[in-house]
């Protein structure tokens, strides 16, 4: 019996699930992303999908990661401290495993590399690009925006999304300002070795980048 393709939500990229595989249209920077995923697999990084090659029509073929991707409004499980803690630890793990790769491939990413080249940043580390088993992060997906850069760039955006640092009335926000601040501190605690003043400054710069 043939496997029935299933369209998945993939932002601006066409994404189709076929059995245990995901087919994604290639775009600017895909060659670098495929290299990165291959290196991550070789190094035993457990949070990223395996790159399985290209389909006959030139699409990326990736391993399907079992679990639930975060979508808004976030369910209670993904608003939990466990979700924040597991996300911070996974991001730290990604940065640690790529710390010697940041200067290896600087050109050819979808987003320009940003100095200092400390790690390979995911570039869009948010609940919608993570896979969860209940409240625990078990996978990171959509590496299209990955690029070399300073780790605080990734940390700041992750905190913006996971705290989340939004106005109480924002459609994707939740919790009081005090609760958001507590969750931001929790993320920093679990990630470790991050300048919290610089985090807030970098959040502001990242948001300005998004609207510019």
What is each stretch, according to the model?
Residues 57-80, 93-101, 164, 208-212:
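A glycine-centered beta->alpha junction motif in the catalytic cores
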Residues 9-10, 22, 54-55, 86, ...:
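A generic "structured core" feature
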Residues 2-38, 53-56, 61-63, 69-77:
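ATP-binding glycine-rich loop module of kinase domains
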Residues 41-54:
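Conserved HxN/HPN-centered segment at the entrance to the catalytic loop
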Residues 73-107, 118-123, 127-133, 184-193:
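Conserved kinase catalytic-core helix
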Residues 13-17, 51, 109-154:
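Active-site acidic catalytic loop and adjacent metal/ATP-binding pocket
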Residues 155-191, 207-212:
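Active-site activation/catalytic loop segments of kinase-like enzymes and analogous catalytic loops
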């Amino acid at each position: 019996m043939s496997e029935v393709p299933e369209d998945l939500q993939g932002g601006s990229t066409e994404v189709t699930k076929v059995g245990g595989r995901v087919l994604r249209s290639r775009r600017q920077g895909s060659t670098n992303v495929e290299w990165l995923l291959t290196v991550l697999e070789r190094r035993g990084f457990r949070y990223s999908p395996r790159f399985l090659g290209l389909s006959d029509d030139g699409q990326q073929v990736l391993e399907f990661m079992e679990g639930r991707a975060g979508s808004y409004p976030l369910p209670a499980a993904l608003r939990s401290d466990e979700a924040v803690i597991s996300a911070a630890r996974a991001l730290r793990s990604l940065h640690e495993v790529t710390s010697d790769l940041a200067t290896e491939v600087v050109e050819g990413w979808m987003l320009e590399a940003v100095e200092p080249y400390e790690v390979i940043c995911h570039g869009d580390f948010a609940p919608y690009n993570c896979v969860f088993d209940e409240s625990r992060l078990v996978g990171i997906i959509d590496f299209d925006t990955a690029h070399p850069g300073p780790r605080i760039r990734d940390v700041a955006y992750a905190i913006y999304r996971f705290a989340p640092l939004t106005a109480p009335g924002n459609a994707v926000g939740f919790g009081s300002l005090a609760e958001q601040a507590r969750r931001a501190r929790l993320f920093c605690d679990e990630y470790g070795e991050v300048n919290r003043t610089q985090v807030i400054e970098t959040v502001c710069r990242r948001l300005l980048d998004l609207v510019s």
